[in-house]
A protein has these predicted regions:
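Residues immediately within or flanking Cys/His clusters that coordinate Zn2+
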Residues: 10-13, 31, 68
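Short cysteine-rich clusters marking metal-coordination/redox-active sites
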Residues: 15-18, 34-37
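A short beta-strand-turn-helix
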Residues: 45-62
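Cys/His-rich microdomains that often coordinate metals
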Residues: 22, 40-41, 78
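Short linker/helix segments within small regulatory modules
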Residues: 24-32
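Short pre-active-site segment immediately N-terminal to redox-active cysteine/selenocysteine motifs
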Residues: 60, 67-70, 113
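Non-catalytic, surface beta->alpha helical segment in thiol-disulfide oxidoreductase systems
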Residues: 113-152
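Thiol-based oxidoreductase modules, predominantly thioredoxin-like and allied folds used
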Residues: 47, 66, 77-104, 111
Length: 153
């Protein structure tokens, strides 16, 4: 499930069901599916300042991870977000934004401390979480936001 490579428009993700490497677009409608077995893929992508606005355009819950490679707590959060992207592959899109390479997105969200996770739905910021959180806390937040989205529908 670990992204294998990325560019400005897509990331390569291994299918959790069959292991096939699939290119996952940063911005696409619908769900990313495995080209081989057609299982839902975790939607975990790297976005840039240029692709960010398209990346958050989805009806799914979006979890934006503002991070940097030198940040220890960011490295601790990364596997948790990967796991959540697998566990909620049909309802959650995780977007990773490297703050060192994408200053505009960082400024737009006033990211002064990282890791910083931003929950977004339909373009609206629902919650901002600053600092590394344990998996149970992040899972609760995802479930709370998904429940609120379901109740609003």
């Amino acid at each position: 499930m670990v992204p294998m490579a990325s560019n400005a428009e897509s990331s390569v993700v291994a299918c959790p069901a069959c292991g096939t490497k699939n290119r996952t677009p940063v911005a696409v409608s619908g769900r990313p599916r495995c080209a081989k077995c057609h299982a839902d893929l975790p939607w975990l992508v790297d976005a840039t300042d240029a692709t960010f606005s398209d990346a958050i355009r989805t009806n799914r819950l979006v979890l934006v991870d503002l991070w940097a490679p030198w940040c220890g707590p960011c490295q601790m959060v990364a596997p948790i977000l990967k796991k959540l992207s697998v566990d909620y592959s049909d309802r959650l899109k995780v977007i990773k934004v490297n703050v060192d390479h994408n200053p505009q997105t960082s400024m737009d969200y006033r990211a002064q401390s990282i890791p910083m996770m931003v929950f977004i739905h339909n373009g609206e910021t629902l919650e901002t979480v600053i600092g590394a959180q344990p998996e149970p806390a992040m899972r609760r937040k995802v479930e709370q936001h998904l429940a609120a989205i379901d109740n609003a529908a």
